[in-house]
Amino acid sequence: MAKYRKTFTSNGKVVSTANQVIDFTQDSFPYNNCNVQYLHIQTFATALRIKLNDESAIHWIDADEDFLIDDINIDKFIILDSGVEYYYTAMSVE
């Protein structure tokens, strides 16, 4: 079982803005320049498009879906759409 050392969350359902960057490399003693290995995004009534890290690939998350990535390091993700309700949780593994 993995141990998580830092957790990030949207603190409930939020509404996106276009090109919104969620960056996990913020300075936050004692875990500076953190990246996450677990990312869960839940959408509600509208689909959502995101990019991970600095990749050009676009990931499409359908409306009312749960999207989970737990096998790569993620420094940040970028939300491409505005006005979409979503929730996220991300964790870094120890």
PLM ranges: what are they?
Residues 35-39, 71-86:
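Noncatalytic modules at the cell exterior or secretory-pathway interfaces
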Residues 42-60, 88-91:
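Short, surface-exposed beta-strand/strand-loop-strand elements in extracellular ectodomains
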Residues 18-51:
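Beta-rich globular "head" domains
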Residues 18-19, 25, 55-56, 61-66, ...:
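Tight coil/turn sites that cap or link beta-strands
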Residues 1-26, 81-94:
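C-terminal interaction-tip segments
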